[in-house]
A protein has these predicted regions:
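Short acidic, hydrophobic short linear motifs in intrinsically disordered regions
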Residues: 24-34
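Residues that mark the N-terminal boundary/hinge immediately upstream of a DNA-recognition element
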Residues: 27, 66-68
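Short amphipathic alpha-helical interaction segments
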Residues: 36-51, 62
Length: 79
């Protein structure tokens, strides 16, 4: 196994992650609206992303995570 581990996200995970923002907190209803899914689906996806450490407890994206040239599936922590 070579290289760093990168989380593999489903299309729904990627849409919900794009709907979150590092600057301010959004409700599950707003995230669901932006991601094109129901609020309860967005909430369960946010919980799954929180377990994977891709979103904070308040639903915000961590400040130092940036999208890379590989797209929405791969996120890297920048030093």
């Amino acid at each position: 196994m070579s290289g760093a581990w990168r989380p593999q996200l489903s299309a729904l995970d990627a849409r919900v992650l794009r709907a979150t923002d590092a600057r301010y907190e959004r409700s599950p209803e707003k995230v669901g609206e932006l991601a094109g899914c129901a609020a309860d689906v967005a909430l369960s996806t946010l919980r799954r992303l929180r377990i994977a450490c891709l979103v904070e407890d308040d639903g915000e994206r961590p400040q130092r995570w940036l999208r890379t040239h590989r797209g929405d599936v791969a996120l890297e922590l920048q030093p």
